[in-house]
Amino acid sequence: MDTMQGESNIVEIWTDGGCKPNPGPGGWAAILLYRGTEKELSGFDPETTNNRMELTAAAAALEALTRPCKVVLNTDSEYVRNGITRWKDGWVRRNWRNASGDPVANMDLWRRLLDAAARHEIDWRWVRGHAGNPMNERADQLATKARMEG
């Protein structure tokens, strides 16, 4: 998604991901909003987990931005929000090990997300899923459609 230099470059993103059963076939989706323009992204993985789909949605959304932006990224995944805002520094300091000394789960996608986030200024916001938020519900519908249609 392109932004014009010198103009407000705040992009609002809504992401969701899931699979059924977990693990199993999964889908992810992201909706990017910028100055009245919307872009929808979605994808499918035949064998995955909910957390991997949530991470993929956030990474893909940020990768779609063609220039550094100010971003408000809305996710209903506490795993994604806590990982990026609270846990990542410790993981990196411990060479991608968690507090128990075990390798961080989904390390490949966490690294992808960190790379995608590096050039942006991001406000990571958690929203309650399935609580009637129209954009969260829409992202959920797109992710479910991607999962169902493969």
Swiss-Prot record:
Between which residues do disulfide bridges form?
Answer: none
Please name the Pfam families in this protein's record: RNase_H
Top-level taxon: Bacteria
Keyword line: Cytoplasm, Endonuclease, Hydrolase, Magnesium, Metal-binding, Nuclease
Catalysed reactions, as listed in the record = Endonucleolytic cleavage to 5'-phosphomonoester
User: For binding Mg(2+) 2, which residues are annotated in this chain's numbering?
Assistant: 16, 140
Check the record and name the PANTHER family matching this protein. RIBONUCLEASE H1
Identification of the protein by name: Ribonuclease H
